[in-house]
Amino acid sequence: PPTPTNTPVPPTPTNTPTPTATPTPRPMSLRDDLPAMSLADWPRPAGDNGWGMHFVIDSYPSEEEIDRNIQRMLDMRMKWAVVLYGDEIQLQKLAPRFRDSGIMVIWRKMLRPYEAYYDWGRDIQILKDLGVVPYMQIYNEPSVAQEWPEGQSNQAVFLENLVAATEAVYNAGGYVGLQFVSENWLIDALNLIKQREGEAVFQRMFFIPHSYGMNHPPSYTEDINAVLSFRIFALIFQEQIGFIPPMIVGEGGWKWGATDDGRYPMVNDDLHRDYYVELYSWFRTGMLSNGEPLPDYLFAFCPWLIAHKMDDNAFYDSFAGDRVITIEAIKAIPEFTRRFSWE
């Protein structure tokens, strides 16, 4: 991710020449009948192994594409997924299929950070009516220039959209999923929720880190370009709100052929296999690659990406070929159920 700067983006000039006093922001309007949740209270899939995958990037996939890729995930014993949807019709098409497959989904409405969305409540209700757990990611990589028109990010615009979305998802009984790749933008968002008296949200909020490893080994911790980089965000939550919410890594892992850091070898077929087997084994052994215990807050890791013709991160269908030996090695890991400290 780009290094965030402290230079604010100038607002679009208006025709009002006289400056006005900044109004006191209104407090968030949150229902008061939802219980706070501890880590043990959060829904998880039956036979949970912490293994996941980001689903296809087309937010309007065909039924054939949906079914083919769910089957691939089932063949690899995946229990979690991040799934994009374009509209409520797609949600109604996708949700029952994942429900019936036993895969727990983090739903992500296809939105840019500058786009307000007014149907969070409807979408949460669709999921509830279908018997689907309403894990809902709100926006995606808002600090990244490519998400904005002409690459000009505007944090103030995004934060207003975030507050409105957080309020709507929370009040509908959904689980509020925050996603940031910028540490500063996360801190600013948490502070704004506190300023708006929205702390109740923190007790029903989860975080979706993006933990890409470049060509760094699984144990790498020198900087944020690591599959272990979710630990950096855990420290921020601990400092800012006093605890660490559930985390489901929603993108990340290794790109086949990656050579970003000259100190480390290219991610060839063998390393791709070895790195992913090690990553997914965290949930089996209870130990991270750096020797730390697997934290209870890390619910799942969903690497980028199950399938895409134009993306050499993809496990299937890529121009770079299918990641056959990685897929077979993952399938060969003995079946297990992930254990938490409270069990």
Question: Whereabouts are the PLM-identified features?
Answer:
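Short, acidic/polar
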Residues: 58-73, 116-127
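Hydrophobic faces of well-ordered beta-strands that scaffold small-molecule active sites
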Residues: 51-53, 81-83, 105-108, 134-138, ...
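Aromatic-lined carbohydrate-recognition surfaces of secreted/lumenal glycan-active proteins
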Residues: 170-188, 241-255, 291-306
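Aromatic- and acid-rich polysaccharide-binding/catalytic face
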Residues: 107, 190-230, 243-258, 303-308
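Ser/Thr-rich, Proline-interspersed low-complexity disordered segments
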Residues: 1-44, 343
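Aromatic-rich peripheral "rim/lid" segments of glycoside hydrolase catalytic domains that contact
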Residues: 31-45, 52-63, 261-271, 275, ...
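Substrate-binding cleft of extracellular glycoside hydrolase catalytic domains
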Residues: 86, 93-185
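Catalytic domains of carbohydrate-active enzymes, especially glycoside hydrolases
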Residues: 61-89, 133
